[in-house]
A protein has these predicted regions:
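N-terminal "arm"/small-domain region of PLP-dependent enzymes with the aminotransferase-like
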Residues: 1-70, 77-80, 282, 288, ...
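Conserved core of the PLP fold type I
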Residues: 55, 60-203, 217-218, 227-229, ...
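Conserved Walker B
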Residues: 213-214
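Short Gly/Ser/Thr- and Asp/Glu-enriched loop/turn motifs at secondary-structure junctions
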Residues: 93-94, 342-347, 371-374
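Conserved PLP-binding catalytic core of the aspartate aminotransferase-like
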Residues: 309-365
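Active-site PLP attachment segment
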Residues: 228-271, 275
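Hydrophobic beta-strand scaffold residues
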Residues: 31, 144, 209, 239, ...
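Structural signature of PLP-dependent enzymes
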Residues: 273-292, 298-327
C-alpha cells in the first residue's frame, strides 16, 4: 500500500523550528513560531490559568466524554467574546457554536461544513495569509483563490486593489476568509472604514465571510480587535467565526477553540448544529476538555477573569513596546530604510519585507531565525537579545543599499 505514497512538502515553519533546536550556536534567536514569549524568552503559563488548573485538579471527578459539540461554557463564552454579550445575532438566537481543537480545528470544521453543503465552494484568501489556511481549506475540498492585500512598497495595506479584485472576480456564494486582527503574517490590519466598505461589497456580492479570530486582545484591546468583525455580523445574513484561546490564554498545547456560525434566522440553527455534529463525529468525534475547562473556570470566577485580563494586557503592551524599541534601536544604527512598518503593524507578527537572501543570511551568519517569507514573531525579541536582533537586521538591510 505505502509503496505508492506521494511525497508531501515539509511544513516550513516546523522545519525551521527543528533547525533552530539543532543549531549549537550559543548566540541564536528564535523569531519563527507565533507563541507569546516573555522578556526572558520563556513561554509562560498565565497565573490565572495556573490557578484555574489547580481548582480543576481538586474538583474534577471524572474523565468522561464531553460530547460532540464540546464544552457548553466555551460554546457560550466564545460567541460573546467575539460578538459582544448583547449582539443582535445572539439576542435573536441566530447562532450555533461548537468547541473545537484550537483555531485550526474551527477552521477545518467550518470548511468541512461549507463543503458538505456546497461541494467545491470557493474561498478567497488574502495574499499572503497564514501558511496553514490553504492546506486546511484544500483538504476540506474547497477551491482556493486569493485577493491582493499586502503592498510590498510600503509594507502596508493595498485596500484599493483588494476591493477592485473582489468586486471583479468574486461571485455570490463564495466564501471570503478574513483576519479579525493582528493579520498573520503581515501584522497589517483593516481599519474600521475598510471594514465598513468591505461589508457593503460582501452584502452586494452575496459573499459569505469566514473570520479567523486567533489573536483577540493582543492587538489593541479585546473590544477593538473585533470591532470590524462585529460590524460585519450586524449586517450580513450568514457568517462563520473561528476563535482560538491558544494565544490569549497561552494554552497552545491544550487545543481549545470554537466555531461560531451565524444563521439567517433562528429556524436554521438546529439544521446547522446537526450538520456540524455530523462533520465532527466523523472527524475527531469530540474535542479535548482540559483547555475548555480552564477557559470556563476563568470566566466563571470574577477575580480570575480580572487577573487574566490584566495579564493579557501586559502581554499586549510588551509586544507594542518591543515594536517601538526595536525601531528606535535600528534607527540609532542609522538604517536608512523606512522603519515605520514596525510600529504601524499590530500584534505578534511583523512582515519585514526581507528577501530570501536576507532571511538566509540572518539565519546562517547571525543565528537569527525568521519565517522564510521574512515574518518575525515580535514577542521573540526581549531585553537580552534586542540589541543583537537590531544589529543583525541592520547588517542585512544595509547590504541591500
Amino acid at each position: 500500500m505505502f509503496d505508492t505514497i506521494v511525497p508531501r512538502g515539509v511544513d516550513q515553519l516546523m522545519a525551521l523550528t527543528q533547525a533552530f533546536r539543532k543549531d549549537d550556536r550559543t548566540q541564536k534567536v528564535d523569531l519563527i513560531v507565533g507563541v507569546y514569549k516573555d522578556d526572558t524568552g520563556g513561554v509562560p503559563i498565565m497565573s490565572a490559568v495556573k490557578k484555574a488548573e489547580a481548582h480543576l485538579v481538586a474538583a474534577e471527578t471524572t474523565k468522561n466524554y464531553v460530547g460532540v459539540i464540546g464544552d457548553a461554557e466555551v460554546n457560550r463564552i466564545a460567541p460573546q467574546l467575539v460578538l459582544g454579550e448583547n449582539a443582535p445575532a445572539i439576542m435573536d438566537k441566530r447562532i450555533g457554536a461548537v468547541q473545537t481543537p484550537g483555531g485550526s480545528g474551527a477552521l477545518k470544521v467550518g470548511f468541512d461544513l461549507i463543503n458538505s453543503i456546497r461541494p467545491g465552494a470557493k474561498v478567497w484568501m488574502s495574499q499572503p495569509t497564514w501558511a496553514n489556511h490553504m492546506p486546511i481549506a484544500r483538504d476540506a475540498g474547497m477551491q482556493i483563490d486569493s485577493y491582493p492585500y499586502f503592498r510590498e512598497s510600503d509594507r502596508g495595506l493595498d485596500f484599493e486593489a483588494m476591493m477592485a479584485h473582489l468586486d471583479a472576480e468574486a461571485v455570490a456564494g463564495d466564501v471570503i476568509l478574513l483576519h479579525a486582527c493582528c493579520h498573520n503574517p503581515t501584522g497589517v490590519d483593516l481599519a474600521m472604514p475598510h471594514w465598513e466598505a468591505l461589508c457593503k461589497l460582501i452584502v452586494a456580492r452575496g459573499l459569505v465571510p469566514f473570520v479567523d479570530s486567533a489573536y483577540q486582545g493582543l492587538g489593541t484591546s479585546m473590544e477593538e480587535d473585533v470591532a470590524g468583525l462585529r460590524h460585519l455580523a450586524e449586517h450580513v445574513p450568514e457568517m462563520l467565526i473561528a476563535s482560538s484561546f491558544s494565544k490569549n490564554f497561552g494554552i497552545y498545547r491544550e487545543r481549545c477553540g470554537a466555531l461560531t456560525v451565524i444563521a439567517k434566522d433562528e429556524d436554521s440553527v438546529p439544521l446547522i448544529m446537526a450538520a456540524l455534529q455530523s462533520v465532527i463525529r466523523s472527524n475527531y468525534s469530540m474535542p479535548p476538555s482540559h483547555g475548555a475547562r480552564i477557559v470556563g473556570t476563568v470566566f466563571g470566577d470574577a477575580a480570575l477573569k480580572a487577573e487574566w485580563a490584566e495579564e493579557l494586557e501586559v502581554m499586549r503592551q510588551r509586544i507594542a513596546e518591543t515594536r517601538v524599541l526595536l525601531r528606535a534601536k535600528m534607527e540609532e544604527l542609522q538604517v536608512t530604510s523606512d522603519l515605520s512598518f514596525l510600529t504601524d503593524q499590530r500584534g505578534m507578527f511583523s512582515y519585514t519585507g526581507f528577501t530570501s537572501e536576507q532571511v538566509n543570511r540572518l539565519r546562517d551568519e547571525f543565528g537569527v531565525y525568521t519565517a522564510g517569507d521574512g515574518r518575525i514573531n515580535v514577542a521573540g525579541v526581549g531585553s537580552e537579545n534586542i540589541d543583537y536582533v537590531a544589529s543583525s537586521f541592520a547588517a542585512v538591510m544595509r547590504s541591500e543599499h
